Swiss-Prot record:
The gene is rutD. It is an enzyme of class 3 (hydrolase). Involved in pyrimidine catabolism. May facilitate the hydrolysis of carbamate, a reaction that can also occur spontaneously. Keywords: Hydrolase. The lineage of its organism: Bacteria, Pseudomonadati, Pseudomonadota, Gammaproteobacteria, Enterobacterales. This is Putative carbamate hydrolase RutD.
Length: 270
């Protein structure tokens, strides 16, 4: 699997891996790259079955497979320890990495994530699946911004959204791959495993997220033994895109704090 690695800003700089959501595209994190690359070696990628990592996914494709594929690609690239910033589905992959490769994951940042799919989120995806079946890729793509962005933000950026729609259609991952990735997301349930997630976790959510209620992040925070939660008042599901200034400040401060916390804890064990 192809990865995009930025040069480390200094020797032994911490590694931060960015994992996008259901769309799978590494370009989702463009508003974060410049600031992160000043402090970290940053890795982003198109998830298997999407973008520049095309493939036909198995019918029973799972979050565990997504985590294993990424970890194997990182090891092949010489990356043994890394922090993860995951958005929605990407946060689920991050939690799976924390369970399956605890020695490798230093810090996890969950952005609009959850323990198990919420009834409201499931309803949203049912509607979107119906659109996909009845109207194809174009209907899916045209409806997607409604679940990602605040209404006023969209209204002020109509030309941008039209361009994004055209790009998304041109690089659509395919109906079967999309549904298999979506089914993996819907089956994931970490509610009985949080006591095994030992790395420090930063939870960022947006109170106006239409797709994933912020209560999901509250449940995640309550269940994780070593977590802190930050709430953005505005931004929607894609809050890192709509309000990158606020998001980036939270992310940079959180990463610095948690990585320092992890390093101090490791020194105490020596």
């Amino acid at each position: 699997m192809k990865l995009s690695l930025s040069p480390p800003p200094y020797a032994d700089a911490p590694v931060v891996v960015l994992i996008s959501g259901l769309g799978g595209s590494g370009s989702y994190w463009l508003p974060q790259l410049a600031v992160l690359e000043q402090e970290y070696q940053v890795i982003c990628y198109d998830q298997r079955g999407t973008g520049n990592n095309p493939d036909t996914l198995e019918e029973d494709y799972s979050i565990a497979q997504m985590a294993a594929e990424l970890h194997q690609a990182l090891v092949a690239a010489g990356i043994e320890r890394y922090a993860v910033v995951g958005h929605a589905l990407g946060a689920l992959v991050g939690m799976q990495l924390a369970l399956d490769y605890p020695a490798s994951l230093t810090v996890l940042v969950s952005v609009n994530g959850w323990l198990r799919i919420n009834a409201h989120t499931r309803r949203c995806f049912q509607v979107r699946e119906q659109l996909l079946h009845s109207g194809g890729a174009q209907a899916w793509v045209e409806a997607q911004p409604l679940f990602l962005y605040p209404a006023d933000w969209m209204a002020a950026r109509a030309p941008r959204l039209e361009a994004e729609d055209a790009l998304a259609l041109a690089h659509f991952q395919g109906k079967n791959n999309l549904l298999r990735r979506l089914n993996a997301l819907k089956r994931a349930d970490f509610s009985r495993h949080t006591d095994r997630i030992r790395c420090p976790v930063q939870i960022i959510c947006a109170s106006d997220d239409l797709l994933v209620p912020s209560a999901c992040s509250s449940e995640l925070h309550a269940a994780l033994p070593d977590s802190q939660k930050m709430v953005m008042r505005y931004g929607g599901h894609a809050c890192n895109v709509t309000d990158p200034e606020t998001f980036n400040a939270l992310l940079l401060n959180g990463l610095a704090s948690l990585l320092h916390h992890r390093e101090a804890a490791c020194k105490e064990l020596l």
